[in-house]
Amino acid sequence: MEPNLLEIPLWRAAVLALVPLLYAGGGAAATVLGQRRGAAAWRVARWSAALALGAALLSLGGLLAGGAALLRGPALVTLGDAGAVHLGLRSDALGGLMLVLISFIGWVIVGYSQPYLDGARGQPRYIRGLMLTLAAVSLLVVSNNLAVMALAWIASSLALHGLLTFFDDRPQALIAAHKKFLASRVADLCLLGGVALVGLQLGTLEIDRAIAAARALPATPGTLQAAALLLATSALLKCAQLPVHGWLIQVMEAPTPVSALLHAGVVNLGGFLLIRVGALVADVPAAQALLVVVGSTTAVVAALVTMTRISIKVSLAWSTCAQMGFMLMQCGLGLHELALLHLVAHSLYKGHAFLAAGGAVAQQRLRQMTPAAPPLSAATWGLGALVGIAVVAAAALAWGLKPAAEPALWAVGGILALALVPLLTGPLLRAGVLGALAGLAGATAVALAYFGLHALFSGWLGSASAGAASPALVAWVLVCFGLLFVVQGAVRVWPRGALARWLYPALFAGLYLDELFTRLTFRLWPARVPAMPGTLAKRPVPQPDMQAPS
C-alpha cells in the first residue's frame, strides 16, 4: 500500500541528497589527486564513505521521528504527455533501510579495498569507479522519479563495468564483463521502455503519483501490462537469472571487494525496483508468472549446481544466483516484505562471506578435525521434513497466519520448513537426543523469527502479504522446491548412487547454458581480450618459407 507522503523538511532532503553527493565527491577527488597522491585519495574516499554512512543513519533517524515524506524537486526535462524528469527525493522505510544498507556496505568495502590493492596500479581509477557506483546506487534508492531511477541504475552498471575490468590483463575477467555489459544493455532497453510506457499511459513519472493513477483505473490497460513485463524482464536480466547468469559466476577474476560490492549491493537492485513499483506489476498475471517461473527455476538449478562446486568464491556466486531467483520469485508472488527481508539478509551475509573468503581454508581444516557424523538415512531425512513442516506451521499459526487467506506466504513457509531439515537432522546425527532437542529449539527460533520479521517488514512497507497469487503459481513453487528437496536428499543419502553419478556431469557444467549464451554474445558482438598466457596466440607462427624447429 502506497502511504500518504508529506512534504519532506528541508534538512531531511539535504541529508538525503548529501549521501550520493559525498560519494560523487570522493570519486572526483580520486581523479584530481591521481596516482602520485594515492594515499590522499584513499583518505578522501574513507572519509566520504564514513560521512555518507553517518548521513544515511541521520536520514533514517529523521524518518523514524517524522514519518515518510518526499520532496518533489524541480523539473529538469519535460517529456510532454509522459510527464517530466524531476529531482524528487523520497524518504520512506524501503529507501531509508536500503540507503543505510548500501552506505554500510560501501564503508566496509572502501576500508577493505585500500590494503587489498596496496601496490596495484590504477588505484585512482578503482576509487573513482567504486565511489561513482555507490553514488549511483544511493541516488537510485532515494529517488521518487522513474526516469531518474532508470538513469541511476544504468550509471551504476557502467561504473561497475570499470571495476570488473580493473585487471585488464585477465582474459576471463574481460570476457565475463563483456557478457554482463551486453546483458545489462538489453536490460536497460527494457527498463527505459517500461518507464516510457508508464509515463505515456499515466502522464507522470513520479512513483507515488503513477501508482495512485494505476490503482484508480478500473482495469489494467495493455500499455501498463507491457510495461510490467518489460520491468520484470529488466529485473531478471540485471539479477543474472538463467540463461544469462554466466557472467555472475565468472567475475571472480575481479578484485575481491568488487565481488563483495556486486553480490551485496548491486545485483539485487532488480528486487528493489520490483518492490518499489510493486503495484504496477502485481496486477499483471503475465509479469507475475514470468518472475515466479524464471526465478524459481533459477533458484532450483543454481542450488543443485552449488552442490558440485569446490571453489569458495564460485560456490558463493552460484548461491547468489539462486538467492536472486528466490527473491524475484517472492516478488512475483506478491510477497514484497519477504523479498525485502531476503534482500537485506543476503546483502549482509554475502558481503561478509566474500570479504572473509580468505579464511575458508582454516575453517575447512577445523571442520576436518571434528568427528564425522553418522551416515544420513532416507528415513531421517524424511522425518526431518515432517518435523520442519510441523514447526513452521505452528510458528505461522502463532503469528495468526491462516493458510486459506495467504496461500503464497504458506508456500514460502513450506520452503522454509524444507530448508530447516539440515538444522534438525545434523545435531540428531551428531549428538543423539540432546542434539535433536537443540536442533528443534533452533528451528523453532528461526521459524518464529522469520514470521516475526515478515510482520515487521510488512508494517514498514505499509502492506500486507498478497493473498491473490495464482493457485497455479503457488503449486509450481511447491513442486519445484519439493523436487529440489528430494534430489538433494537422494544425493546426500546416496552420494555415489546412480542419480548422483547421472546428475553430476551436467550440473558441474551448469547444464551448458552459459556456453550457449557465450557463443551468442560473441557472435553478436565479439570482445577484444588479450591472449591467455601459454596459448598458441602467444607463440610465433612459422611462415611458409621457414622451417619450424624440430
Residue ranges and their predicted role:
Residues Q35-A55, D118-L132, N144-A150, D169-C190, ...:
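Membrane-interfacial loop-to-helix junctions in multi-pass inner-membrane proteins
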Residues M1-V15, G25-R128, D208-I211:
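Transmembrane helix-loop-helix hairpins at membrane boundaries of multipass inner-membrane proteins
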Residues G129-A214, M324-L366:
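Alpha-helical multi-pass transmembrane bundles of energy-transducing inner-membrane proteins
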Residues Y23, L33-A40, L428-A455, S463-S550:
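Membrane-interface and transmembrane segments of multi-pass membrane proteins
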Residues G27-G38, W107-G119, G162-Q172, C239-T256, ...:
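C-terminal ends of transmembrane helices
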Residues L64-G88, V148, A155, L189-V244, ...:
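Juxtamembrane/interfacial segments at transmembrane-helix boundaries in multi-pass membrane proteins
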Residues W47, P74-D168, A187-L189, A264-G265, ...:
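Internal transmembrane alpha-helices of multipass membrane proteins
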Residues A136-S143, G193-G203, N268-L280, L328-L341, ...:
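Hydrophobic alpha-helical transmembrane segments in multi-pass integral membrane proteins
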